[in-house]
Amino acid sequence: MGAMVIVGYRPKPGCEDGLLALTREHVPILRRLGLATERPALAMRSKDGVIVEVFEWRDGAIEKAHQHPEVMAMWGRYAEVCDYVPLSELSETKDLFAQFDPIDL
């Protein structure tokens, strides 16, 4: 069985377009490499501009990803355009029904 993950990306100043482009190609690359399932990925934006992504890793793929040069390079590009944000820092997570603005992938 895979693992569902939810991750927050805070765009660095002037980097939101680059972050959105990278997020749109993220899961398709992981799928091509056999690391993510075909379950539809979701992306959304918090009130303060954090991009939230939800997708499913294949069983055992998280460990494999940390050793794959293409994934490591992609994560390096993420580091150039964003900072990772714990979900607990998003004000929406304090609401019973957290609401976000949808982003088309």
PLM-predicted stretches and their roles:
Residues I6, P40-A41:
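A general structural-boundary detector
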